[in-house]
């Protein structure tokens, strides 16, 4: 093993208090700018590594979701064809579309942050400065996944990239399920995620892997699917070994993994990630850490 137990413990810790303060400053300032435009028609919350408390790199971006609550997209895939026809015959349209929402969001942010604002493919970016970190603001609508005509199975968010790709996610379920997993594993779930993210950055810096081989989201999902009994209280070295071995063996056996939200399969047509990506990453982590 190339690294001591204490080194793994150090890697498992979240970002510093200073970084957390800069994150809070960004959230407060951006929330005020959005409220000035949209009032209480929106819900504003975090998603991603900062929200899930798995961030490890200094000066990382924070993802701020602005969900417009006065309209929603329906997901009718689980309804019968006859129920879909009934729903579509009765539905009404809000008259406010996503292109307008993103444009209004950009305008609201430019009114406050002026030249610090950049429109990106999937978000509006507010660049950081000495007292706030860079933030990606994601305007979106509510998504309602219907299980029957009268029942909503789950609520998430939906938006479109500027190149017209539909994006659906369930950040609230991701957060709550990840927190539950952490509480059930002696708080080791998120700590193992942080360690693997540190190793990922080191492998990228050393030129061992491409910088887009695995995302933070992908790492969180892989570790989430490791059974709770593989997380050993007070033993980071053994737990990390268990996690890497379990994921590697599962990928060789084509195991079905879910996203942390438990509402999508991890390996599906909606995701560019493959089991081969996970296999390759686990092998690189094993070699880098020096397990035998």
Curated annotation (Swiss-Prot):
Its cofactor is Mg(2+). GO terms for molecular function: 3',3'-cyclic GMP-AMP synthase activity; ATP binding; diadenylate cyclase activity; diguanylate cyclase activity; GTP binding; metal ion binding. CDD domains: NT_2-5OAS_ClassI-CCAase. It comes from the Bacteria. GTP binds at residues 48-52, 197, 216. Mg(2+) binds at residues 61, 63, 136. Binds 1 Mg(2+) ion per subunit. Its EC number is 2.7.7.-, 2.7.7.85, 2.7.7.65. Belongs to the CD-NTase family. E01 subfamily. This is Cyclic dipurine nucleotide synthase. It comes from Elizabethkingia meningoseptica (Chryseobacterium meningosepticum).
């Amino acid at each position: 093993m190339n690294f001591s137990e204490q080194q793994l413990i150090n890697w498992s810790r979240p970002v510093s208090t200073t970084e957390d303060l800069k994150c809070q400053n960004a959230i407060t300032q951006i929330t005020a700018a959005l409220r000035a435009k949209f009032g209480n028609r929106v819900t504003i919350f975090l998603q991603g590594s900062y929200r899930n408390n798995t961030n490890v790199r200094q000066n990382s971006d924070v993802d701020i979701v602005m969900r417009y609550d006065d309209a929603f997209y329906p997901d009718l895939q689980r309804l019968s064809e006859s129920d879909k026809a009934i729903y579509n015959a009765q539905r009404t349209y809000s008259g406010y579309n996503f292109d307008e929402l993103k444009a209004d969001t950009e305008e609201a942010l430019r009114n406050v942050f002026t030249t610090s604002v950049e429109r990106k493919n999937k978000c509006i970016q507010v660049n950081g400065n000495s007292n706030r970190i860079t933030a990606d603001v994601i305007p979106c609508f509510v998504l309602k996944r219907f299980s029957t005509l009268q029942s909503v199975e789950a609520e998430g968010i939906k938006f479109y990239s500027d190149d017209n790709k539909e994006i659906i996610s369930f950040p609230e379920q991701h957060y709550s399920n990840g927190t539950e997993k952490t509480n059930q594993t002696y708080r080791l779930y998120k700590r193992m995620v942080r360690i693997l993210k540190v190793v990922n950055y080191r492998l990228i810096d050393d030129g061992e892997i491409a910088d887009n081989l695995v995302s933070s989201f992908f790492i969180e999902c892989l570790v989430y699917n490791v059974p709770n009994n593989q997380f050993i209280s007070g033993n980071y070295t053994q737990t990390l070994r268990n996690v890497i071995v379990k994921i590697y063996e599962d990928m060789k056996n084509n195991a079905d993994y879910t996203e942390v939200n438990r509402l999508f399969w991890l390996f599906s047509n909606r995701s560019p990630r493959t089991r081969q990506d996970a296999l390759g990453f686990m092998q690189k982590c094993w070699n880098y850490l020096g397990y035998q």
